[in-house]
């Protein structure tokens, strides 16, 4: 029930042997929101919403169903994944009630290299970024040599999620 079962359903891919699990979705939720109650939001994006998000963020929305929870204080807990170079990177994001990034944690990293994106200093670049700005990998968000595609795709994912907040979550 609750976060564990929905989050468990979200993690559809079986990590290959080189996958590194840094945190569970439940641990990330606790880290981000403490003991606040997380209310699961049943969210299925329409084709029009997916197109609008793609147009606003420049990033395609692959799935119509999202793993999303709203906090008692109006914040959001979102589970998402992006492709690294060849494999998926699962991550969790906390968004404020205004859609700005409060925190990001890498949950599972499946690539054989390039996992420097788990570095807290690199992830901190996203904090306080909101839907009003399109983040650019290599400009607002620094690259990490050896993790270029992971950096770029996580940046794209954050842009997609903040625009998703603006166009969808904020209206829930």
Question: Which residues does each predicted region cover?
Answer:
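Flexible, solvent-exposed loop/hinge segments and secondary-structure transition points
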Residues: 16-144, 148-152, 156-172
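An N-terminal domain-start capping segment
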Residues: 1-2, 99
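N-terminal export signals
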Residues: 2-18
């Amino acid at each position: 029930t609750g976060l564990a079962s929905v989050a468990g359903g979200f993690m559809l891919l079986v990590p290959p042997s080189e996958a590194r699990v840094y945190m569970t979705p439940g641990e990330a939720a606790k880290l981000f929101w403490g003991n606040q109650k997380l209310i699961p939001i049943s969210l299925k994006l329409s084709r029009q919403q997916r197109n609008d998000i793609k147009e606003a963020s420049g990033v395609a929305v692959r799935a119509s169903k999202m793993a999303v929870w709203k906090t008692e204080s109006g914040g959001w807990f979102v589970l998402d994944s992006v492709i690294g170079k060849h494999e998926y990177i699962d991550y969790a994001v906390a968004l404020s009630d205004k859609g700005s990034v409060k925190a990001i944690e890498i949950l599972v990293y499946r690539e054989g290299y390039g996992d420097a994106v788990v570095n807290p200093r690199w992830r901190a670049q996203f904090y306080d970024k909101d839907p009003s700005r399109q983040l650019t990998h290599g400009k607002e968000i620094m690259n990490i040599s050896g993790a270029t595609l992971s950096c770029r795709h996580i940046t794209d994912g954050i842009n997609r999620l903040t625009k998703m907040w603006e166009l969808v979550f904020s209206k829930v």
